[in-house]
Design a protein with these regions (language model features):
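Acidic, glycine-rich two-metal-ion catalytic cores of nucleic acid-processing enzymes
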Residues: 132-215
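N-terminal leader/targeting and assembly helices and adjacent pre-domain segments
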Residues: 1-156, 164-165, 212-215
Length: 215
């Protein structure tokens, strides 16, 4: 279910590292409030654009996979809308109940924090502090990128199921001993398609499978 998403995430992980490393080579003598604002703004515009491209690919793949699973479960094959860029934008603009924030607003908060940390590092002429700030910012952006990638897949999957006529889904937890208590308790529970509980934590990889018509 997340195989394509994981491949796209590997691309994004390398891109994030490259983008923040590029910012790290700027010398202290080149930094001022205007330059820092421009550099960090341009950085996050690029990062969000790259995420958008890959979220769209992941959503389309999830749509196709969900349709195939629904057909395998006995639902009639039919044409259903495929996610487009507008779909991804609308999804990212919605409130996320797991993260507790809005995607773009959180990206701007991360940018502002990074800009402030860079200016503080310059004030103290601390290259170590500068590099640490970039590393923390990269890790935080990676965390947000990962979380929203998995949520994109989940949202596109559920929507495709519903469009295919699926009425109920079954929660499947990967029972490897590392699962959380909530996910363990939800394993194999059946939920109406419109009443599936939010994932209990970030980066949850529990799957939702269509309940066959005969059930």
């Amino acid at each position: 279910m997340y195989r394509t998403a994981d491949k796209l995430l590997e691309q994004l992980k390398k891109l994030i590292r490259r983008e923040f490393n590029r910012l790290g080579i700027i010398g202290f003598d080149e930094l001022n409030a205007f330059r820092v604002t421009k550099e960090t703004t341009d950085l996050f515009i690029r990062l969000m654009a790259e995420n958008m491209k890959r979220y769209l690919l992941a959503a389309k793949n999830a749509n196709a996979n969900a349709k195939a699973l629904a057909i395998a479960a006995g639902f009639v094959d039919r044409e259903i809308p495929v996610p487009d860029e507008a779909w991804v934008r609308a999804f990212l603009a919605s409130y996320n109940f797991v993260s507790g924030y809005l995607y773009e607003q959180e990206a701007e908060r991360k940018r502002l924090r990074l800009a402030e940390q860079i200016m503080t590092a310059k004030e103290y002429q601390s290259r170590t502090q500068y590099n640490d700030s970039l590393r923390r910012a990269a890790n935080l952006w990676w965390s947000q990128t990962l979380h929203y990638m998995l949520d994109t897949v989940d949202s596109a999957t559920l929507e495709a199921y519903e469009l295919m006529g699926v009425k109920k889904v079954e929660w499947h937890t990967h029972m490897d001993g590392k699962e959380c208590k909530v996910c363990r308790e939800r394993h194999l529970k059946v939920y109406p398609i419109g009443d599936v509980p939010p994932k209990p934590h970030r980066n949850c990889r529990c799957r939702l499978m269509p309940v066959p018509i005969k059930k």
